[in-house]
Amino acid sequence: MTVKPELNEITPYLQFNRQEWGNFRKDTPLTLTESDLDKLQGQIEIVSLKEVTEIYLPLSRLLSFYVTARQTLQQATYQFLGKPEPKVPYIIGIAGSVAVGKSTTSRVLKALLSRWPDHPNVEVITTDGFLYSNAKLEKQGLMKRKGFPESYDMPSLLRVLNAIKSGQRNVRIPVYSHHYYDIVRGQYEIVDQPDIVILEGLNILQTGVRKTLQQLQVFVSDFFDFSLFVDAQAQVIQKWYIDRVLSFWRTTFKDPHSYFHYLTQMSETEVAAFAKHVWNEINKVNLMENILPYKNRAQLILEKAADHSIQKVYLRKI
């Protein structure tokens, strides 16, 4: 186990390089094939079986211990209360910048966790569904702040998380379309008492100043049983973001119904410049102000290199 130079002796994290972390796999079986992985890839990020074996299988093993421990604690609580134990999902929060690979991480984890021996039901929810509609953002002058905390319907997200964590059935999740860059009015996904919920979002580790006891403020992270932050250097994420926009420009943006179809009238150089501008003026600002400052609230940090591979893992010890 190595020590990161810039972290002092009272760091709350244990740090592991790739080889050290991979050793924690032990005898956890690899349940994914190359064919399975093909369905899980991101727009620009390719996850190899080697990455799954060395990084995600040990993480899956760790989570299996954590979920079991949480279930035992929950059983003890309801035994003490003398009440029947409800079915309450284990909630995992995955945070990080735009284009850092949160969705790919969520998909790989879902695939692995759902293949545990007891075959748990795993659902992935993204906070995109809780963005205000473009019409409302336009009215409030927030279109250029899309993805910032104020662009989300936080009361609705908190109500949904409370319902899920209370064991309610058939909880409705609003649907967001990246193709139309907007909420799909009247369309919902249903979450019906899964065993595990993965919540993926930009600002989900963010907190503020809590109010008085009479006005106790609740944060998204209050509902998490485990939280994970996907990290990389800002200049590296910028390149990934530009590459992703160019990839969409060559494919989905060609659809006349796509919100960004107008970009297909530009050259590749112009689109790259557009993406860089959006990164610098919006996404980087959000990262520095609302995402990165809360990285150390996560229980586990995955640190990526420029080739998308995870090179270091930080596990909270306290």
From Swiss-Prot:
From the Swiss-Prot or TrEMBL record, state where the protein is found. Answer: Cytoplasm
Its GO biological process annotations read: coenzyme A biosynthetic process
Pathway as given in its UniProt record: Cofactor biosynthesis; coenzyme A biosynthesis; CoA from (R)-pantothenate: step 1/5
> GO MF terms on file?
ATP binding; pantothenate kinase activity
> Which CDD domains is this protein grouped with?
PanK (cd02025)
Q: Which InterPro entries match?
A: P-loop_NTPase (IPR027417), PanK (IPR004566), PRK/URK (IPR006083)
Note the Gene3D superfamilies from the entry.
P-loop containing nucleotide triphosphate hydrolases (3.40.50.300)
Keywords on this record?
ATP-binding, Coenzyme A biosynthesis, Cytoplasm, Kinase, Nucleotide-binding, Transferase
- The answer to whether keyword ATP-binding applies is yes
Provide the residue positions that the database annotates as binding ATP: 96-103
Recorded family membership: Belongs to the prokaryotic pantothenate kinase family.
**Protein name (record):** Pantothenate kinase
Q: Which organism is it from?
A: Coxiella burnetii (strain RSA 331 / Henzerling II)
